[in-house]
A protein has these predicted regions:
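Active-site metal-binding loops of divalent metal-dependent hydrolases
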Residues: 1, 20, 27-28, 86-88, ...
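Active-site neighborhood of divalent metal-dependent phosphoester bond hydrolases
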Residues: 4-86, 90, 94-118
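Acidic, His/Gly-rich catalytic cores of divalent-metal-dependent hydrolytic chemistry
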Residues: 94, 99-185
C-alpha cells in the first residue's frame, strides 16, 4: 500500500474505508520503523507522514494493527488458505516466524535453512503442506499457480498488471497498469 504508487494515503484510506482484510508488508513495516526512529531516510516516507498531518497517529496505530498473516479454515481442510505478504520459512509455523521473513522472503537456502539469494530456489518449492499459501512481494517471479501456493504479484507498479484471485475456484483476474509507477530495477 505504501511506497509503490503515486497516492499511498489514498490507498490507505480506501482499504480502511472498505474494511478490507490485508496483511502488513515490507514497505508498511519500513514506514512504521521510519516513524519510530523519526529518521529522514526516505523522501517518500517523509512526504507520506506530512500528508497524514494530524491524522498520522491514527494511521500509525492502524498500520500497527495489521496482521502479518491471515488464515481461513483449518490447515488440513481442502479449501483452507493463508495470506502472507512474502512467504513462509519451510517447516516453521507462521506464528513462530520472524516478521522479516513473512514480509521479505523470496528464496530459501535449504542447506543453511535461511532466506537465500537470487541463486536459490523459491521458498514455495519447499512448502509441502496442503493449505494454500497466497502471497505477493515478488514481481520478478510473476504469477505462481501451484496446488498449495499462489503468487499474485504481476508487477503492476512496474507497468505490468494488477492480479486478483477469486476463492475457492482459484480464478485469476488481471487488470493492466495505467502507468509505470516505479521503474523496474
Amino acid at each position: 500500500m505504501i511506497n509503490r504508487g503515486p497516492k499511498p494515503l489514498e490507498v490507505l484510506k480506501l482499504v480502511h474505508r472498505l474494511g478490507a482484510s490485508c496483511v502488513l508488508g515490507n514497505h508498511e513495516r519500513s514506514f512504521l520503523k521510519h516513524l519510530k526512529k523519526g529518521s529522514q531516510s526516505s523522501d517518500s516516507f517523509s512526504k507520506l507522514k506530512e500528508e497524514m498531518g494530524d491524522h498520522m497517529p491514527f494511521w500509525e496505530e492502524w498500520l500497527q494493527s495489521l496482521p502479518l498473516f491471515v488464515s481461513e479454515g483449518e490447515e488440513t481442510e481442502p479449501d483452507s488458505f493463508l495470506v502472507v505478504h512474502a512467504g513462509l520459512a519451510p517447516g516453521i509455523s507462521p506464528q513462530d516466524t520472524d516478521p522479516h521473513i513473512l514480509t521479505n522472503l523470496r528464496t530459501w537456502d535449504p542447506i543453511d535453512q535461511r532466506p537465500g539469494d537470487e541463486n536459490h530456489p523459491a521458498w514455495y518449492t519447499f512448502y509441502q503442506k496442503s493449505r494454500t499459501i497466497i502471497f505477493g512481494h515478488w514481481a520478478a517471479g510473476g504469477v505462481v499457480m501451484r496446488p498449495n501456493a499462489i503468487g499474485l504479484d504481476s508487477g503492476c507498479v512496474y507497468g505490468g498488471s494488477l492480479t486478483a484471485l477469486s476463492w475457492p475456484d482459484r480464478s485469476l483476474y488481471q487488470f493492466p497498469a495505467q502507468s509505470i509507477y516505479y521503474p523496474p530495477q
